[in-house]
Design a protein with these regions (language model features):
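Acidic/histidine-rich catalytic cores of soluble enzymes
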Residues: 18-19, 109-194
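Alpha-helix boundary/capping detector
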Residues: 36-37, 69-70, 98, 109, ...
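Hydrophobic residues in well-ordered beta-strands that form the structural core
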Residues: 50-52, 92, 128, 157
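Active-site groove signature of glycoside hydrolases
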Residues: 80-103, 122-135
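Active-site-proximal loop/turn and secondary-structure-junction residues that shape catalytic pockets
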Residues: 23-25, 56-59, 92-99, 132-134, ...
Length: 194
């Protein structure tokens, strides 16, 4: 399946009317307007709305090296523009970085804050998933959101991505900043209960 098949399969097979993309599936197409136009047309053809592009592999927005962080911020610009073109409300980013929790928190406040400022000019949210590293501690990420304090910078709480941390507490801490929610389910009984 390709991204071009995604809207049709989403609608015809699953009866859904919205999709989220993963950047790694079209890494070299973020600035390819012909490709993006075709993808947008496929969505319109099947009545499917594009919601989020989950961006991976573009550098660390919480890198403690200012030069590396600047490069990561710039690498995300093309995804902000692609998200805007496709009609998405957000890009999902990662707040990873090496260093102490305090060092990476300060770097994340800078990196996410500056990217959110850029994205605001395009009407796009920058949302962070608790997606490994320090971001899997809800309090750490919630403090970053409070410091950034921008309406277009928020979270994408994932119920299954908290490290040795009360997932309900983590969700409670991140929900005030949430622009979406990601959940994982694994095993069900005959009544549909997990």
């Amino acid at each position: 399946m390709t991204n071009m098949d995604f809207p049709r399969i989403t609608k015809e097979t699953y009866g859904l009317d919205a999709v989220e993309y993963v950047s790694t599936f079209f890494r070299d197409k973020a600035e390819d307007m012909e490709y993006l136009t075709n993808l947008k047309n496929e969505c319109e053809k099947y009545g499917v709305k594009s919601l989020i592009i989950m961006v991976d592999g573009e550098g660390s927005l919480a890198d403690t090296s200012l030069a590396a962080r600047n490069k990561a911020i710039e690498n995300h610009y093309k995804w902000v523009k692609a998200a805007k073109f496709l009609g998405c409300h957000s890009i999902r980013v990662n707040a990873a970085g090496r260093g102490t929790m305090g060092q990476t928190q300060a770097a994340a406040i800078d990196g996410l804050g500056r990217l959110a400022e850029y994205a605001a000019g395009h009407g796009i949210n920058v949302i962070v998933e608790n997606h490994g590293g320090n971001s899997s501690y809800g309090k750490w990420l919630a403090e970053i959101m409070k410091c950034i304090n921008k309406p277009n910078c928020g979270t994408l709480p994932d119920l299954g991505n908290f490290y040795e941390y009360d997932r309900y507490r983590g969700v409670q801490e991140l929900m005030p900043f949430a622009k979406g929610v990601s959940g994982k389910t694994h095993d069900f009984d005959q009544h549909g209960n997990e």
